[in-house]
Amino acid sequence: MELARYIDHTALKAETTKDQITTLCAEALEYKFASVCVNPTWVKYAAEQLKSDDDVKVCTVIGFPLGANTPEVKAFETKDAIANGADEVDMVINIAALKDADYDLVERDIRAVVEAANGTLVKVIFETCMLTKEEIKKAAELSVKAGADFVKTSTGFSTGGATVEDIRLMRETVGPDIGVKASGGVRDFEGAKAMIDAGATRIGASAGIAIVTGGRSDSDY
């Protein structure tokens, strides 16, 4: 298992500095991670830092971390991020709309980002710690219907992160052709392997180096 290629090497805290983004990108190049995941303000800089290796992508976040923006705002964010060099976007669904069973809005919200991305890879963040199993399943179904490429557990900014049980449910719901990303609380090799064994095809973590070197991080993301 080439574990590094599963990892989105992540730095999303508000206080993340330019020096920390520089280090993040250098580490991603060294370890050959799938991507760096950064806030939109750092996309252009990260793209410049990673231009020597087409295999290490720039991932950013949309409607993050609450998912409470309108579809139109999320679409604008998506276009702006791609113009700045983003290769992948991780959007947060409208969590309240899902809880209200306003499935038309949930789907329209996802589809707005998918259409704005125009072929750029889209991952849909559910914030599974806030959802029932039925809501997770419904979010996965709506993500597939709206044309998303991936479903993702968590922002890393709420009360819980990825669980093996949720990853398994998401994989069972979306089938074999959609990616599943585990994020939030994956801190070591054993945790990452458990997620992959349950069906994850990507791991979002700030602990990427610890994961691939057999160490452990205390980071929540």
From Swiss-Prot:
CDD domains: DeoC (cd00959). The keyword Magnesium does not apply. Keywords: Cytoplasm, Lyase, Schiff base. GO terms for molecular function: deoxyribose-phosphate aldolase activity. One of its GO terms (biological process) is 2-deoxyribose 1-phosphate catabolic process. Pfam families: DeoC. GO terms for cellular component: cytoplasm. Transmembrane segments: none annotated. InterPro entries: Aldolase_TIM, DeoC, DeoC/FbaB/LacD_aldolase, DeoC_typeI. The active site is at D90 (proton donor/acceptor), K152 (schiff-base intermediate with acetaldehyde), K181 (proton donor/acceptor). It is found in: Cytoplasm. It catalyses: 2-deoxy-D-ribose 5-phosphate = D-glyceraldehyde 3-phosphate + acetaldehyde. Pathway: Carbohydrate degradation; 2-deoxy-D-ribose 1-phosphate degradation; D-glyceraldehyde 3-phosphate and acetaldehyde from 2-deoxy-alpha-D-ribose 1-phosphate: step 2/2. Gene3D superfamilies: Aldolase class I. It is an enzyme of class 4 (lyase). Its main location: cytoplasm. Its EC number is 4.1.2.4. PANTHER family: DEOXYRIBOSE-PHOSPHATE ALDOLASE. NCBIfam families: deoC. Catalyzes a reversible aldol reaction between acetaldehyde and D-glyceraldehyde 3-phosphate to generate 2-deoxy-D-ribose 5-phosphate. Belongs to the DeoC/FbaB aldolase family. DeoC type 1 subfamily. This is Deoxyribose-phosphate aldolase. It comes from Exiguobacterium sp. (strain ATCC BAA-1283 / AT1b).
